[in-house]
């Protein structure tokens, strides 16, 4: 069968030139895309022709004589063609031998023209390499040597969940110990049972650049992150302030984007799903001369699922008063302004440039006191009810080798805007307090802030007799300032009051300095000590300065692939956010302390080769102090939580079948002044146990055709909530009544089917919540509602790679 190599090569060269001219400016068109030797041009032309007509032995004979002399892309091209010839001759062993040599030449080799069976060999050989990460120690190391338990989520694992998943759902599926929590329009996460009003206990990064804002330390785990751009997600399960400082309390999530060399083309993808959902992605990448360029753009919009009391379960009756017909709960609605993610990375020799802009606009599921009618409310500054967050980021880095010392310098900036447009509920039929407050009132709050910073890091390797190791040290500075704010009040859905007085003047600034050091010492090739220490000082506005010392100590033993042991002690902190400290200062509370986590973890991991099984088991003890919770009329910084737990992960891969399972269990040892039920010994809103199972099966795999079936199941144990009710007394005082409510355990199934042709065209059908099970999330406040999750929904998608 003939293969149209020449047409593809011509198209790719045009694409390479177009991207390079656009992003790098004018570049001589006669420059070669790679370091190949044009003297082999005639040899390759003849070899391609012989391969197309089945003269495989002639191709092998011709290339065998020259491949040893080749370098760069010429050698890669020869090795690829030789492997394809052996594969066509059904000599799989020889094909794998040359494919292995090809990967040694280029770890990121990828070619959309390859037959599917050859792509399978390449992917399998790639997977055989030990995964290296940089998130845990800021240096390249294997997962086995990382000083903390690590979860790696690959692009394939993300695809196996379907196209309509947000970041929080992906993390909750693959990371044991992580669970979604929710507060009306904010996608939040808990780790080992700890959470806060903003997603401030887990540090989220993109290529090492912090995404959590500095106003309230939060970052929503929603659709403002394109999943199609992701190469992998590295998750550190445990405290990491010794390297990253503030916010890295219970976990670190580092999103690693694809490289231009890996994609080497243009990919376009579109999906349409239930509830008026549209999702689109475009990714472009290439390597031109010494520059690696990757560009992405993503768009998400959805009307969301509309729920009413009559089509819900008995849970709704536990939380809401009667309401007018035509008003809804809006579940996962993203509309009014598009939710998008655009950005690019450029690497040129030692330089790296990152630029991105992310926007999220999510509808509140409920109004202030229950169901509401989104369409009745007027726009304010072109914004409708819901929560919006816009972030623009820019970073420039430079790496250089100065003798034995590696230097890394970076400067960066983040410009952040939050909008909170809260709508009241519909008019009620009764005479409760809510009726007086629910006459189409609304509240609009906008804040803008800016962060500028820089860092300098140096590292070097050393030897001490038969021992060796690596040390690094660094310094970081940040300047944060609130630059603008606006508060408005409205009534009657469309009426607008004059600009309201600011409850607090947030237009102030703060500076912070951080100094850190780390040593990784190999006593033996199999015995490693990893120690780190970071000192942070924050010059806080109108409050005492705060300092934090964050240590980490890890002892790692890696005797063989079947067994690796890891014992880790670490401490981390989250300073109370600028927003909440400033708000509480106005009511006389200026004694907020940093939130702390001290953790002890014992991990066992390894591979059981005969069973094709990998495993990871982690036993942890956590001691949280000074946790922050929102109370009904104020805030509390005195929360204490101590718990023990177990995490376990197992993965299996053989031929066309891949499967993974993870499980989590925790037990509260002590809890005070926190979201905790003493009678049930349970943390409110989070499960005691979860189990996830994910399976992928290639039903068909033949040359250019592949048909894959994938599915997942998630078991979540029951959760307890603290229901709060307000009763208006005859003298207009308010009586607050609280009671505990149980949400039943659930089992949610997803399934999908994907067809791929020639590694270019992909068609997929995804079904989320296959059994249409009612399930709910709850959030970090004493106004604990049972927030709906989506019911059964379908999405069809198509993608094409040029």
Predicted features by range, described:
Residues 209-237:
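Short acidic/polar hinge/loop motifs at secondary-structure boundaries
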Residues 118-159, 617:
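Short, acidic, small-residue-rich periplasmic hinge/interaction motif at the N-terminus
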Residues 150, 168-209, 213:
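Extracytoplasmic beta-strand/coil segments of soluble accessory domains associated
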Residues 345-361, 387-543, 616-617, 660:
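Face-selective signature of the C-terminal outer-membrane beta-barrel domain
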Residues 522-528, 612-615, 619-623, 636-726:
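Gram-negative outer-membrane beta-barrel transporters
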Residues 89, 285, 291, 296, ...:
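Conserved C-terminal beta-signal and adjacent last beta-strands/turns
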Residues 262, 271, 287-383:
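Periplasmic-side early beta-strands and strand-to-turn transitions of outer-membrane beta-barrels
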Residues 404-412, 418, 558, 564-566, ...:
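Membrane-embedded beta-barrel scaffold of Gram-negative outer-membrane proteins
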